[in-house]
């Protein structure tokens, strides 16, 4: 009976995390053929953002330089020039193919993530029973921890998220989110987010300690500040 009771929170957590992912993954596989066919049939020329447009234009400019080089090599034999033209043509076809694959990848991943968040939001509204079970289990688990362990955990998490060495971790995390949504990485935006997120989290943490922990467990606050110093 106790084992069955202990497995209920685990099943609730598993359903909350993996059920939306499984549904969105299934939708992605179902949409893949339709999106690919739609893109290739319509031959869409829509660029999803200015960064992608600059990237593809840069590649075309590189090919244009090769064509200009072709004109400068008129003294080469006709066979050599034909080989050069064939190579440039193949590179152009490959560039267009890569561009189409990138656009399809962007559309699929963006749509999949939107579906995932919609399902997760709906699940959080409709799946009240699972959330109540999970919340009670988390509160019971935290209640059984000593103040020292709680303070150590808070200190560890804060150092990982807003500590001196957290910058590289934030860059990897935001970069992976960019990639997951199918967008091209923008170093300027990532640098701005990396310099902003830790400050916001640090402010929220201090406010939480001041308003909540001081009221619930003053001894935990004392231990936390002692360890932090």
UniProtKB/Swiss-Prot annotation:
This is Potassium/proton antiporter CemA. Its main location: plastid. One of its GO terms (biological process) is potassium ion transport. Keywords: Antiport, Chloroplast, Hydrogen ion transport, Ion transport, Membrane, Plastid, Plastid inner membrane, Potassium, Potassium transport, Transmembrane, Transmembrane helix, Transport. InterPro entries: CemA. It comes from Lotus japonicus (Lotus corniculatus var. japonicus). It is found in: Plastid, Chloroplast inner membrane. The chain crosses the membrane at residues 114-134, 189-209.
């Amino acid at each position: 009976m106790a084992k069955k009771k202990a497995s209920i929170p685990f099943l609730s957590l598993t359903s909350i995390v993996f059920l939306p992912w499984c549904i969105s993954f299934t939708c992605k596989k179902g949409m893949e053929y339709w999106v690919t066919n739609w893109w290739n049939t319509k031959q869409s020329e829509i660029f999803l953002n200015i960064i992608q447009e600059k990237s593809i234009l840069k590649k075309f400019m590189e090919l244009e330089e090769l064509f200009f080089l072709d004109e400068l090599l008129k003294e080469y034999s006709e066979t050599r020039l034909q080989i050069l033209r064939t190579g440039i043509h193949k590179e152009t076809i490959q560039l267009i193919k890569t561009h189409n694959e990138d656009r399809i990848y962007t559309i699929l991943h963006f749509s999949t993530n939107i579906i995932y968040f919609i399902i997760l939001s709906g699940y959080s509204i409709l799946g009240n029973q699972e959330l109540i079970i999970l919340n009670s289990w988390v509160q019971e688990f935290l209640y059984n921890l000593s103040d020292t362990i709680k303070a150590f955990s808070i200190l560890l998490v804060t150092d990982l998220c807003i500590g001196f060495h957290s910058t590289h971790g934030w860059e990897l995390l935001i970069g992976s989110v960019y990639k997951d949504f199918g967008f091209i990485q923008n170093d300027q935006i990532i640098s701005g987010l990396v310099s902003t997120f830790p400050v916001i989290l640090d402010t929220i943490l201090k406010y939480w300690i001041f308003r909540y922990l001081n009221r619930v467990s003053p001894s935990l606050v004392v231990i936390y500040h002692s360890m932090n110093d």
